[in-house]
Amino acid sequence: LKNKYHEVVSDEYTAGIAFLCRVINFLEDVLEDAECDDIYVNSVALNARTVVLHAVRCKYDVFESIEVFQDRYRVNVKEGIGDLPLRELYEHVIDYYKKTLHRRMKQYAWKTHISGVEYYLGVLFNGKGFLIEGEKNKVILPGTPQCFSAHTHPLDPPVPSKNDVKAVNRILVDRGIGHVIEAVRSSLAIYRVRPLSLRDYETLKSLEKKGSFVEMIARTADGAAIRARYIH
């Protein structure tokens, strides 16, 4: 990063995104371990960084699963009434990003629009984040596992390049939630909407060499595992 701009970004917004990512991974593991039909969380408690959950028709003791996983993901868990199903939490992460860090990345998208130099934002699972300057028309791919990331794009609307597909894959393989490509007028969010299977991961790795975004969406469980939508 010699002579390149870089900044540690650690605030309530990076912490909020990381918390939601950890909650999702926690719920996925509990759901699988206890073999529940579904699992809900309380949306009000979630805003206070607490997990109040209600598991539906579990084959095994859900409390044992909670004990196993809550320390691993550093979440406070209580039993109660839930109104937000796990399947909607993935969208919740994108919406939270849109209300928070999205505006900041738009400012850097303008810089990229003028100079062509791209900027990358990474959010770690511990709530810390970083913002780094890359090269012209080239995104930087740090090796540190991240739960969410975004980078700026010089063209509008943003069309994922081979490097962009690689960035998305890196996030998903590390059990992150998604990646946003930020352009001046529109932004493309690419994210998972359920746990990825081993077959999904194998498909992602094979498509990384091709760099085909359309094929990545289509071939990953017929589009069910990964979703893309524009945010403004």
Model segments located where?
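Short beta-strand scaffold segments in enzyme catalytic cores
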Residues: 117-125, 180-184
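N-terminal start-of-chain detector that recognizes signal peptides
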Residues: 90-96, 120-121, 150-155
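Active-site-proximal loop/helix of nucleotide/amide-processing enzymes and allied scaffolds
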Residues: 1-80, 134-232
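Short, compositionally biased leader-like segments
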Residues: 71-96
